[in-house]
Amino acid sequence: MPAKYKLNDEQFFLLTYPTTPADFDGSGIVAILERLGCSYRVGRELHQDGKPHFHAMCCFDEPYSDGDARRTFTVGTRVPNIRVRRTRPERGWDYVGKHAGTKEGHYIVGEK
């Protein structure tokens, strides 16, 4: 397991699952975010080599802390990269869906 990644009183952050198998559908990401009660947008994109990866923008109403966020957001064996967004969370939201509906294989998996 990778080193712990702490989130301290953060409201907005972006998760990236950079390498996923073709049968990874993102439902595990949605399930975690539903359980945590945040607003979210999860999107699927294809790398140039045709392999999928996922982004998830997480928006909490109140500051969120987690002593081991990588573990919390791990889906199966897929560990995300985590990037805090302290300003302009709408940019992260837009980034997650930037090619949805315009490029084959790119779509929104879930949104709340």
Please provide the spans of the model-predicted regions:
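Catalytic "initiation/cleavage/transfer" segments centered on a nucleophilic residue
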Residues: 1-36, 61-112
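Short coil/turn motifs at beta-sheet boundaries
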Residues: 8, 49-51
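Short, glycine- and small/hydrophobic-rich beta-strand elements in well-ordered beta-sheets
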Residues: 35-49
